[in-house]
């Protein structure tokens, strides 16, 4: 671990409500620490809120000597006793102070050369939060979340993100909580439902506030706390991204950290989280604020006309898309293809190694039998399914199936790699994200399927079954409903998605149409392969999109999910005898499936 100066750490346990903790910070903590800095006894300080062993403040003071630290601890302990306490099953005492060494999360903030800048940002974040809390309305009630949203917008703006980039970044940050296991969180469905209800009620006001803030940051007329935070972020990011070393050539001042754009965005997501923490925003509130801010940034509808899911005007999004994505005869230059961009990997912690997945051979069954046997399965799905069976399903449907030689006009030969389904430009941008629930020989988890190497790439833990069921009403209906699909004992759930970011770079607006076609081709191939293996399922094209992308770890704009495909073995084939192929709800929307 690397840091600058000598930091002294105090853990002050304050078993109090958030508002009382705010008041204590303003009345007792900040004046004392600022006085130490003003007297030259410390060169800076910051704090965070924490819950381990009981609610407490972690206070870090730089270059504070032992005597000064002891006096500070004693004064804060006495002052804390006067703050109202709330009962709780914690092993700490209200007002207790512990001296605990400060151990920075160096890698999380960009490495040793970037850490000094991170620590300065912690101090700037502390000052901004205290200033916002000291305002006449403070952060009481919903005002706290309004301040948080403003600071989220200000962070993205200061990093040079336009509205689309900012929305993507904020959504990624909110979705990242899906992989956190150390903190108890609300189910994703609860957070998304709250975001959607607030957005529906306040869409216009939220959009106006965000636009006004961005304009104010551009002209220097924004409110003081978002403005000061944006200035601090802009200056710090310039140092983090700069390639020149510090004045002594060591980078000790944080200059020359040379962080890439992707790593910088990842680092600033951590800084945004700590800003919310200091403000007293809970993780679930943080998820909601970031999602709400992101949705606001993508708003383009007329403020006076509420959005409709069934628009009839010429301005309807689907009408405009179909018109603008056409290949126009005589105007080939407008739709000329572009070179394919290289695939990008998301910055972040090192991933676990890929998991090799063997594949059993396909059984020798007649095509007519497979075609006749492929139909959507209602009722409970179950195993058994083992690793070789899963490999057979995935790689016989997804992976390379053959090669051929193509002689070109100049006489050279090009080798074409084939898979069992067609793909625009042979880019194979239809992909599969996999939830392994109960498959022998494969650890439960969330995986990305890598057909090129016939491996599973670990993405994270598998979500709780109840959260998977919340993705579609087909999965959450009572077992007595004839259209219920039971996944309590299902071995796997597949998510078929498109790498639209890659496809769009080559085909522009045509890419979405091509992606929809390819994911349909792949899904049918998966279903036929499943039928040959004695498996069945229902491809669900209607699901709760934002929640599904979050649970599967997909970027909803660059990696749009097209189908959820729970697979397993039918419990009793006879139960299907009376099911109509066009049963209730066979259309789209969260209640729509496919037959």
Predicted features by range, described:
Residues 509-518:
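Short pre-catalytic strand/loop immediately N-terminal to key active-site residues, enriched for Gly-Thr
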Residues 1-337, 357, 370, 374:
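An acidic, charge-biased composition feature
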Residues 73-76, 408, 510:
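"Short basic amphipathic alpha-helical interaction patches in structured regions
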Residues 522:
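Gly/Thr-rich phosphate-binding loop signature of adenosyl cofactor/nucleotide-binding cores
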Residues 534:
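Structured binding elements
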Residues 248, 256, 264-506, 519, ...:
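N-terminal accessory segments that position/regulate proteins before the catalytic core
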């Amino acid at each position: 671990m690397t840091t600058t100066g000598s930091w002294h750490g105090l853990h002050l346990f304050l078993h109090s409500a958030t508002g009382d903790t705010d008041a204590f910070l303003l009345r007792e903590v900040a004046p004392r620490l600022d006085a130490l800095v003003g007297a030259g006894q410390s060169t800076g300080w910051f704090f965070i809120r924490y819950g381990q062993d009981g609610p407490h403040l972690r206070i870090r003071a730089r270059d504070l000597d032992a005597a000064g630290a002891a006096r500070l601890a004693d004064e804060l302990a006495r002052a804390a006793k006067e703050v109202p306490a709330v009962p709780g099953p914690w092993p700490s005492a209200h007002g207790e102070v512990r001296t605990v060494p400060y151990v920075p999360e160096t890698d999380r903030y960009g490495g040793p050369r970037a850490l000094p800048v991170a620590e300065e940002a912690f101090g700037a974040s502390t000052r901004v939060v205290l200033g916002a809390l000291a305002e006449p309305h403070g952060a009481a009630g919903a005002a706290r979340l309004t301040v948080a949203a403003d600071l989220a917008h200000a962070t993205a703006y200061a990093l040079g993100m336009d509205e689309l980039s900012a929305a993507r970044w904020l959504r990624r940050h909110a979705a990242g909580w899906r992989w956190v296991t150390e903190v108890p969180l609300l189910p994703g469905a609860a957070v998304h439902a709250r975001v959607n209800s607030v957005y529906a009620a306040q869409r216009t006001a939220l959009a106006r506030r965000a636009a006004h803030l961005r304009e104010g940051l551009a002209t220097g007329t924004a409110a003081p706390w978002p403005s000061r935070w944006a200035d601090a972020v802009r200056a710090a990011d310039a140092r983090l991204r700069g390639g020149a070393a510090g004045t002594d050539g060591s980078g000790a001042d944080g200059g020359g950290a040379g962080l890439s754009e992707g790593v910088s965005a990842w680092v600033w997501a951590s800084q945004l989280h700590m800003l919310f923490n200091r403000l007293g925003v809970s993780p679930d509130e943080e998820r909601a604020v970031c999602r709400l801010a992101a949705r606001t940034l993508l708003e383009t509808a007329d403020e006076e006309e509420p959005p409709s899911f069934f628009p009839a005007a010429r301005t309807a999004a689907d009408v405009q898309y179909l018109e603008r994505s056409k290949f126009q005869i005589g105007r080939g230059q407008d739709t000329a293809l572009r070179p394919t961009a290289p695939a990008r990997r998301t910055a972040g912690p090192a991933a676990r190694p890929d998991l090799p997945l063997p594949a059993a051979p396909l059984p020798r069954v007649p095509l007519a039998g497979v075609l006749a046997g492929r139909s959507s399965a209602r009722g409970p799905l179950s195993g058994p399914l083992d690793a070789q069976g899963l490999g057979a399903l995935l790689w016989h449907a997804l992976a390379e199936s053959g090669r051929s030689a193509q002689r070109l006009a100049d006489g050279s030969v090009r080798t074409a790699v084939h898979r069992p389904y067609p793909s625009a430009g042979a880019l194979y941008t239809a992909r599969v994200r996999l939830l392994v629930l109960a498959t022998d020989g494969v650890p439960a988890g969330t995986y990305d399927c890598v057909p090129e190497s016939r491996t599973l790439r670990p993405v994270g833990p598998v979500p709780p079954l109840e959260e998977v069921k919340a993705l579609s009403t087909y999965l959450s209906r009572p077992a007595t409903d004839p259209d219920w699909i039971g996944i309590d004992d299902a071995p796997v759930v597949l998510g078929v998605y498109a790498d639209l970011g890659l496809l769009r770079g080559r085909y522009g607006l045509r890419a979405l149409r091509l992606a929809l076609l390819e994911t349909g081709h792949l899904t049918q191939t998966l279903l036929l392969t499943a039928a040959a293996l004695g498996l069945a399922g229902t491809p669900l094209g209607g699901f709760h999109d934002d929640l599904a992308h979050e649970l599967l770890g997909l970027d909803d704009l660059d990696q749009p999910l097209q189908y959820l495909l729970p697979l397993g073995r039918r419990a009793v084939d006879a139960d299907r005898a009376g099911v109509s192929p066009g049963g209730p709800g066979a259309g789209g929307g969260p209640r729509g499936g496919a037959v």
